[in-house]
Swiss-Prot record:
UniProt keywords, alphabetically: Chloroplast, DNA-directed RNA polymerase, Nucleotidyltransferase, Plastid, Transcription, Transferase
Region feature Disordered, mapped onto this chain: 534-574
The reaction(s) this protein catalyses: RNA(n) + a ribonucleoside 5'-triphosphate = RNA(n+1) + diphosphate
Compositional bias (Basic and acidic residues): 551-574
Name under which the protein is recorded: Putative DNA-directed RNA polymerase subunit alpha-like 1
Organism: Pelargonium hortorum
Region Alpha C-terminal domain (alpha-CTD), residue ranges: 419-574
GO cellular component, one term: DNA-directed RNA polymerase complex
GO biological process assignments: DNA-templated transcription
Protein role: DNA-dependent RNA polymerase catalyzes the transcription of DNA into RNA using the four ribonucleoside triphosphates as substrates.
KW ATP-binding (keyword) present: no
Gene: rpoAL1-A
Amino acid sequence: MTNNKNFADWDSLECKDLHNDLLYGRFALSPLTAKESRLLKKGLREALLTGILCLRFTHAKIQNACKNLNLMNIVGIQESLDEILKNFGKIILTGKLEEFVGKGPFVAILDVRGPLNAMAVDIELPPGIKVEIETQHIATITEPIPFVVELRIELVSSTSKGETGITDEEGFSIDPNPPIQKVNSSIQGYEYGGQTFQTLFIEILSTSPTVPNKALLLVSMKIMNLFQIVLQAKYLDYKELEKGIHVGVFCVSALRAEQSKWIKTILEDALYMVGGRKHQGPLTDEEDDSIDSNFTPVQNLDCRIESYEEEGQTFQRLFLEIWTKSPTEPQEALWEASAKILELFSLFLQTSKENEKDLKQIIKDWTENKRKHQEVLRLLDSEESGSIGWITKMKLAYMHMTLLSMNAMYILLVHRLKPDYDRYNSITDQIVQELRASLNKLREIQKGEYSEQRILVHSIAQEIEAALQKYETTYKLDDFVIKAKKDMITMIWDKERADLESSLIRWESDEDYLNLKKMNPVEMDRSFAELQYQETLRKEQDEQSSQQQKDQMEKRRWERQNRERERKRGNREF
């Protein structure tokens, strides 16, 4: 395996929807050295499990009394307390997560009266937070009693664990459904051109709406933003010891707990990948003879964390003590290690291959669907369909022809998305090249006065920050535009197509339809017409039921808003 870019690349091997809103993704990264594989394996796992955040209910204080402490049942409610808490844990909350980082917990209130099926739509939520599925079930209230719950909302990651059982009068903990369920990785070695390389395989199991490939991009952006700050760490102390050992102490401030852990996890591996710095001018014979191919410039890394409070929030200072051996200075090792980390995680900014694969897969699926309908039409037009009634044949032909046209139009519309993808890929590829050019400048900094080096590093760090900000802005805008266009295409075609295809599937598997094949053409047409009539009635009932549900949701929203208004006026208390 190789590429023509002289750096690693990533590929999406498999992405699929599983049951219970779970999403699965499998990815490969190659070519990598053994040390690069180790760094990415540890860093990605840590960042995915702690860096992908979501809003979840974490605690419930229920006013209703339990009638049986052993069974944990609540008077007048069908579900057990354990089931109710699990239902709260499954509710997906949405909002602009960056607005909630470092804030909270927040309070939501469920205040309803039975008999009623309490749903997510009934919960009074703080501004900026919504439930993704309003119809999600919470509890069945079987008697005319109030059901009142005070809920705590927190920003959690996959390592956040709720306590189990009762916490006396304070209420009950809810085990939140994490955004990243599992991260597995494996490494496979191979030989190419007389050299040994490795491929790192990453498997991610996530909870909707967290998409595995976007989770990879998100944590990579977070790590890169973090290490462009590490580049500018405050230099606190420096001393020279015997045998050419240099010790430098640095401090990175205003970190969250998970960021401190990322730096410790990733930086140690990167520091031991650092090579000797470039000399200004040619090496002397004596210097050249003294170079050891196994020489390791970084001798040791010690980390210390100090927590502090600022404006009601808890932050950390991370102190880094780096030991190096001449001629490498501690600050040079830190810069080179940070550059290596930025280079490795920048590979996930290359999304052109993934976007192209996404388009090709959509077109492939719909082209296959189109082919199936063409085949059915061919059979209906052949002598093999002579035993089918004329009306039946015409109706089936019409349905397949309609679906064929829909598939063809959908493929055409998806093809029209390609210029949007191409424009996005062109812009992001250019940004990635700018970023890598800045990293090359960082590696090329020659030995000299620390103050001069520091000015250069600060300038390069600003370039890196600007490139990352430009990428993030472009990604958010274009991702929104492309997603909106894809959703519009889906909205236009999917419902009618799905209705027609589900009708065909039902008919072709229905016992009455199978019996049609045993009838003569006239009887077949009569029976087929009856099946069509029943299908029409079913659709009307489904539409009526759907409209009733919409009306019910609208009514429940109005009732919830009315309760909120009354509570704000002081007419209702929790």
